[in-house]
Amino acid sequence: MMRSHYCGALNRSHIGQQVILSGWVHKRRDLGGLIFIDMRDREGIVQVCFDPKYQEALTEASALRNEFCIKIEGEVIARPDNQINKNMATGEVEVVAKALSVYNVSDVLPLDFNQNNTEEQRLKYRYLDLRRPEMAQHLKTRAKITAFVRRYMDENGFLDIETPMLTKATPEGARDYLVPSRVHKGKFYALPQSPQLFKQLLMMSGFDRYYQIVKCFRDEDLRADRQPEFTQIDVETSFMTAPEVREIMEKMVHGLWLNTIGVDLGKFPTMTWQEAMERFGSDKPDLRNPLEIVDVADIVKDIDFNVFSDPANSSNGRVAVIRVPNGINITRKQIDEYTQFVGIYGAKGLAWVKINDINAGLEGVQSPIAKFLTTEKIKAIFDRTSAQSDDILFFGADKWQTATDAMGALRLKLGRDLGLTHLDEWKPLWVIDFPMFERDEEGNLAAMHHPFTSPKDFTPEQLEANPTSAVANAYDMVINGYEVGGGSVRIFDPKMQQTVFHILGIDEDQQREKFGFLLDALKFGTPPHAGLAFGLDRLTMLLTGTDNIRDVIAFPKTTAAACLMTDAPSLANEKALEELAIKVTRSE
């Protein structure tokens, strides 16, 4: 027998028991006549004592070094009161070793568990990095999350159904990973960016509650929180309204937080996309931050200051204010830094007003724009923003999107810098009623979610006539400023689906080529259906308290989409390429 108990599971209830432990030497201390080691496995660490009473084990222990893989047979005893370690889960007990076996020795590690290693080192020697207790804990939490999700979905009548990994390329906003076919030379499969169409087809097949914990692939430029392969908790339902879908998924996430970290998230408020953008400058607002954005275009539209009056009088402009309570001590240097910061988002500047005395009107403020304002105007701004003495007001004025993005980013930065964001709180919400379409960089209409999202209360004819005023029957779940899941009611009318394709510039020939199977399926009594998908990696990040998505994936890629451990991607051998009828052009 190699193991009777896990190291990290031992406690006072095991005192007097004989145990067999298998794991690694975490630390070793030689005190002359006694040797102590901290022994580690996936459940934690326990102190093992080698005593002269068991001389053979003590002699063998003198050769132990960090990360040797060993087996201990011994007895659990209570630690003396003055040696209890309250920082360890097993700190009230230790194991007296009666026998020691070494499964395997270890070279000196290229990582140091007691100090910060570079990201490159950690990813190159990932199998060693995962031995660190905090990393093991992340993956155990991830396993706990998926176990809870499977249990919840099963209890609520959802069927776990797999969908294909080798599929057809579809335009979903990012580039596909392509897989060449050896049998069909010159043709390619695509790895799925999501199981979207297959789960809709499952609804058409009569499986009215589907879920899957599934790998998805996107060949996009990576950011810190993106990976080329990621995992979704994918869900689809038939005969359920959007509020019903949100309710059953909210209950799942509520239970997940309670089960994993013992936190009651309470009832999730619902907010429209328009309100989220206007008040918080983001479609994924972090409600732990009390700062809000307030519109003042109507107040400043006729002042003699073009920076404000031009956007205030434009249908596509915005003049907005953030009030920072007690922000009067923000220095000019800090204001200059914030001005530079909003420039990243396209803002041309950042006006400000410091309020020394709210009752003194213009005499009571300090501001480079005071000369353009009247007493009536400044009072109206004070009233609109609920300003007080000792506050500072920051103004953004530009095109609506630029001003909204810049002020939204500034709001988050101010919340962090000034300690206003309540980092110990959980603030979930649903964001609903997104625009159906948005303009891409070329000015063409693109689906804000995806082309299979249904509009709210629009006929195909109304949508064709006025696509930019359509609201999507879509919803995102947001927790602490992170979008953890998103979904929508799907189009189940073939005419509506063709109308959306047409608005997106997909002509009938392209529709048949890319989505013929879907358009055909929609003709055969398709039920109303809706669903959503959660990012498992993002959920795990939140529940483990890490801000690095790579910490919650066992073997992640770098931001350059490479695996430093296996050296993937790599060159293919010529014979394999020949069989695939592929010729690679090498860059010079």
From Swiss-Prot:
EC number of the protein: 6.1.1.12
A GO molecular function held by the record: ATP binding
Any Gene Ontology CC annotation: cytoplasm
CDD domains in the record: AspRS_core, EcAspRS_like_N
Cellular compartment(s): Cytoplasm
Aspartate, as annotated region: 196-199
PROSITE patterns (alphabetical): AA_TRNA_LIGASE_II
Annotated binding of L-aspartate, by residue: E172, R218, H449, R490
Keyword Metal-binding: no
Catalytic activity reported: tRNA(Asp) + L-aspartate + ATP = L-aspartyl-tRNA(Asp) + AMP + diphosphate
Subunit relationships: Homodimer.
Function: Catalyzes the attachment of L-aspartate to tRNA(Asp) in a two-step reaction: L-aspartate is first activated by ATP to form Asp-AMP and then transferred to the acceptor end of tRNA(Asp).
Full protein name: Aspartate--tRNA ligase
Species in which this protein is naturally found: Histophilus somni (strain 2336) (Haemophilus somnus)
Lineage per the UniProt record: Bacteria, Pseudomonadati, Pseudomonadota, Gammaproteobacteria, Pasteurellales
